[in-house]
Amino acid sequence: MGQSGRSRHQKRARAQAQLRNLEAYAANPHSFVFTRGCTGRNIRQLSLDVRRVMEPLTASRLQVRKKNSLKDCVAVAGPLGVTHFLILSKTETNVYFKLMRLPGGPTLTFQVKKYSLVRDVVSSLRRHRMHEQQFAHPPLLVLNSFGPHGMHVKLMATMFQNLFPSINVHKVNLNTIKRCLLIDYNPDSQELDFRHYSIKVVPVGASRGMKKLLQEKFPNMSRLQDISELLATGAGLSESEAEPDGDHNITELPQAVAGRGNMRAQQSAVRLTEIGPRMTLQLIKVQEGVGEGKVMFHSFVSKTEEELQAILEAKEKKLRLKAQRQAQQAQNVQRKQEQREAHRKKSLEGMKKARVGGSDEEASGIPSRTASLELGEDDDEQEDDDIEYFCQAVGEAPSEDLFPEAKQKRLAKSPGRKRKRWEMDRGRGRLCDQKFPKTKDKSQGAQARRGPRGASRDGGRGRGRGRPGKRVA
């Protein structure tokens, strides 16, 4: 049996073809279409419609959140090969459309004078033709009236041309051209008309009945006696199905196009059906860079050479200050790092000397710090023993002048909390906080005459009646 599956050469050829397709796809321009700020529902829908125009070379499921800044989008666009940003924003008075070229600019800012969504355009048409296969390839760009009207007009034309991949008219496949994007410039009003169309190619030179027979859906001929009635008169067909064709849209096909009757070297009519969206734009300004930079052109503001020179000097001064701050910050970081390293070395040397010095003291017989602390504690205990012996011998506490060192040592220590004793109050049935009774400087004779607390002089039990003594037999 022969070996099943593809051969090694077939696998290699397929891998090389896939690699070429990926390289060709990466070489094409790609775009991000999103909104910035609080735009509202209609502007968000307009951004989705513009994203539909830019398919398939755009991020159709792009989600930009409020916390994402323009720098975040630029950082993401680099690895993905995105070359253009199309941003829609809205203020209290106007709607703006920005076209940015990545990564170095320029940025074109347009004011949206009027716009219509896809649903508005489709609802106004009697018949519309739009399906998913049309968006499998980028649209054909048509620029009209972009003549020698200034450098800003030439820049606009270049920016729009770079939005879509270039087309080689000698090698292009006509079956891949299903849509058309028309941008018309009006020199008088300086406005741009943005229109999006669907392209349909139909054969010419045939009657309405023959065109109906060539369609995929066969017409209803239940009321006809013969097929000649359909071919001769076109009975049963509405007048709206007959569209006027002329020299403006009839051409000879250089190659066969998908559709019945569209053969090579035959006459066919190219029909356009608007599918939206629709915008009327006016250029406001042209800036260097991505959103921030020198204004190269402005439609409403004009500045003299002195003002431009002053702006340029202020910008250069700002850049110099920024570079100076960065250099100072780098020096501070280096200095702190050196100080940290020197402190670490000094600490290690001190720890090393401390270890060496401790061993030398033990060898020479000098008491260490621990031993001196222990001797100090013994002195404190000796002073306490002297005070206690004086109290036992004399019967009262000594004066402060007799033992001044003990007082100073007590003051040096941090005072502790007072001790408390918790006892159960039998009468009330709850815990009570009782403090130790304070000792007063009285003689033992006075304490003996007074007796314990609550005891009477006659040996009774206080306020109550005394219990009789026991009899002694």
Curated annotation (Swiss-Prot):
Modified-residue entries (N6-acetyllysine), positions: 438
Basic residues: compositionally biased ranges: 409-421, 462-473
A matching Pfam family: Brix
Organ and tissue specificity: Widely expressed.
UniProt keyword annotations, A-Z: Acetylation, Nucleus, Phosphoprotein
GO molecular function: RNA binding; rRNA binding
GO biological process terms held by the UniProt record: maturation of LSU-rRNA from tricistronic rRNA transcript (SSU-rRNA, 5.8S rRNA, LSU-rRNA)
Extent of Acidic residues compositional bias: 375-388
Protein name per Swiss-Prot or TrEMBL: Suppressor of SWI4 1 homolog
Main subcellular location: nucleus
Its biological purpose: May have a role in cell growth.
Gene that produces this protein: PPAN
Note from the entry: A chimeric transcript, characterized by the first third of PPAN exon 12 joined to P2RY11 exon 2, has been detected. It is possibly produced by trans-splicing. The chimeric transcript is widely expressed and can be induced by retinoic acid during the granulocytic differentiation of the HL-60 cell line. The resulting chimeric protein shows a much lower activity than the non-chimeric P2RY11 gene product, but qualitatively indistinguishable.
Cell compartments where the protein resides: Nucleus, Nucleolus
Compositionally biased residues, Basic and acidic residues: 335-352, 422-443
UniProt-listed PROSITE patterns: BRIX
